Structure formats: C-alpha cells, structure tokens
C-alpha cells in the first residue's frame, strides 16, 4: 500500500469464434497497520556522575505514514533511564558510575498507534571522569613529647579512580609529607608542656588536580622517667621507669 495504493488491470475475454471483449478494472489495496522497525539511537555514551544526562535521540522506521510511536524501557538498567521528548536520558537524581558499571544495558520498545511493537537493546558506554579523593587516613595520630623531627605516621588517600597518585600538603609549617609519610621537619620539636594536641589540615591532590582536605588532631604524649641519675661505670644499671601521662597515647616507644 505504501508503494502503490491502486493498480489498473485490463481483462480480455475471448469466445470460441475468436471474438474478444476487454474491460479495465481498478484494484485498490487496503492499508494494514505494520509494526515499527529499526529503532535508532543517535548516541550511546555519557560521562559518569552526570545526573539527568541525555544519551541521544530515539528514532524508528514505520511504513505507515504519519503513525505515532511511543517508547518504553526495560532491561538490566532500564530503571535508570526515561524518554523525554523523544530523547533517551538518565533520570534526574540518577547518575552512572564508571567504577561500578562501565556499560549499561537498556531495551527500548517502540509501539505504534495501532498497538504493534518492536524492541531493540542498546549498550550505553559510561565514560570515566576523574573523581576527587574522598578521604585521608593516617596510620597513627600520636607523637612523643620532645620529638625533634621524625615520622608521625603514614598517610593514605581514598579515591574511586584506581592507580591514582597523590601529593600532600600540611597546614602546619612544622610538618611536611615525604613519600606519603607525615613528618616533623628538622629543627622543630613538640613539647607536651606547651601543647597536648596539635590540630592540622592535610590536603591531598590527585594527578588531575582534584583535592580533598581532612583535619587531624595529633596527641602529644608526655614521657616521664622516675630517676635520671646513675653511677658511672655501671653498665646495665636500671635508670628508672618510663611512663606516659596520656592513657589514649598509641605511639610506639623504643
């Protein structure tokens, strides 16, 4: 019907004596509803963590001119998406995470006004975008009173991007980070008598320049010796007992 709705046919009748009669007929083709075919999607990739992102424009073929097509979604990740004004998009307040799924699968069903339908499954590629660090841990938050330079603890940053490298800076100029270790700089010392805790902020920055700040409170432990004198030439003599005044102090003493 879509190619030609009527056909002209001439029928010729011949009797036994050879006489003939011809008559022309017009044959009309009745239009029958046909299902949509060949669902298309103009693009099939979105950036991760982009809530409500438009994937692409949906289209379909239907031999019935002027037919209206509606779309429905299903499949493994169908609930992540919706169709708005013919565009396939992530729902608002919904985003995809490359680290969780690098590809999302959605099945699109196109239904015409006569109720006939066809479906097609699309793979939506999620493009990895750099994620900022989300946390910083320190292996110990205690240091010894009287410490003159030395390592406080090892810093570790959390980041969803695997294989990421980090740099660190510290808000307190007495400290520095060397090879991931928080250290008291040479020429500096901490004393329990003047500060029992030290609060500082560590900033970690990934290779793409995204950063994260975290505040730490370091406990300064006081070491006391019961006796500080001993006789000369008395190797092995016990000088006194060591004690630390802070029951929460966790640094290792050797």
Go through the PLM ranges and name each one:
Residues 1-37, 42-53, 58-134, 139-150, ...:
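Acidic, turn/loop-rich segments in luminal/extracellular domains of secretory-pathway
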